[in-house]
Amino acid sequence: MPDENYYIYYPYQSDMTGKTAASTGATLTDAEFYAPLIDSWQPRKDQSSYEAYAASDLMTANGSVENGTDNSLTLTFSMAHRMALAVVELPAFVYRFTNQHSIPDYVFSSPTEFDSEALPYLVSDGTCRYLFHPSAGMELSAYNDSRQCEFSIEIQPNQIAGGSYRLYKPNGGRVMKLHTLQVGDFFLADGHLLPYDADNEKVQTSNVVGIVFQTNPARIGDAEKKVLGGEVHALVMALKNAAVDVTFWITRPVESYLPACSSKAEGYNDISGYWNSEQMRKACGDFSSYPALKAADEYNKYYPVPATTTGWYLPSSGQCWDLLQYLGGCPALADPAEQTSDALGYDERLGQGDVPAALNKWMAKIADKDKHTFTSDDNIWTSTWSRSSVHNWAIYAGGVFCRYLYSAIDYESMIVRPVLAF
């Protein structure tokens, strides 16, 4: 109707008494009509949930009217934000990989906690957002997991107009580095990477916790991919054993909670130690009856890693296969005929060179106190099941031996060497 005006606002308020301007006979804009509401609006201090953030986002509109068919009217509203918005690009490090085969960017940052009264809404794109009244300004401060100040932002009153936003990049925001991801690269406790050919001093002054042994996404399990949000980059071997001379189980179960892998191909294709471990945890409640799984899991207490990883776990037989192929230099394990064979996986491969020495070579730059070297006749537990037994890889000077152990007794040195995916 020509003499009528239509106004809307969001979010809904149960009491709008005194929140709209008195009629003067003149046509008012929505900003003028809702001036008392806008002036008195107080965004929530804690906007850390989407619901709280949305409830703080005052919007208004003045409707336009169009005549439709059959004497109908069409009302159109275009909502305008009335609060000011601070968008903060959280400090993060981005590795952009230059490998020939495509590997997604690896993004990580220290956990950020806010200690200001203002608590922003964290968005999945690596930013946080906070709405505030333009006339009030705001202060936002955060610290990292070392309890050190990460950043502090102060916005003065009327510095940002209502309906506007400003992007802040404390500490430079996202920092990008080009890197060619390779087997042998060093993985650090804070999530950073060092190239495999970094000099000794750089390696020994960095907090290295693992060695990259697989960079092919096709050889990383679906469970690892799922827990990492669908994007994976590599597998990493720990520098130390989680346990030595430990059994896989205390009392051998009558049946397994895992699928049986008996052939070479089945062992090679079992590439998700994370799934195996979590399946056992789900079925049994905990790892109290499975010392090898428990040792790998508890390794996370002593050598914590960022949330951008799976955390440490017991590798599967296929992951151990890759570890021995790429770090151990075993030519038989690189043979496609072996990888696709239906023959029994319980098999000794001779003529593979000094496998422990080959593995240790990748850790040569690591200080002795920060690593456990491999020795001849080490037996590496895996989480792969074979009917009533568990896959175990023996390594020695001259070859490797994939055994199926039917009992929990020791065979030479039974070790747990955890892995992780990132």
Predicted regions mapped to residue ranges:
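Short, low-hydrophobicity acidic/polar segments
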Residues: 1-85, 93, 161, 169-170
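Tryptophan-paired
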Residues: 1-24, 95-172
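Residues within well-ordered beta-strands of beta-sheet-rich folds
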Residues: 7-9, 85-89, 236-238, 313, ...
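Low-complexity, serine/threonine/proline-enriched polar segments
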Residues: 37-56, 252-288, 292, 343-370
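Outer/extracellular conduits and scaffolds centered on Gram-negative outer-membrane beta-barrels
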Residues: 82-84, 315, 321-322
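Short, compositionally biased
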Residues: 141-146, 154-308, 409-422
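Loop/turn elements at helix/coil->beta-strand transitions in domains of secreted/extracellular proteins
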Residues: 232-234, 307-312, 318, 377
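C-terminal, surface-exposed recognition/capping segments
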Residues: 318-422
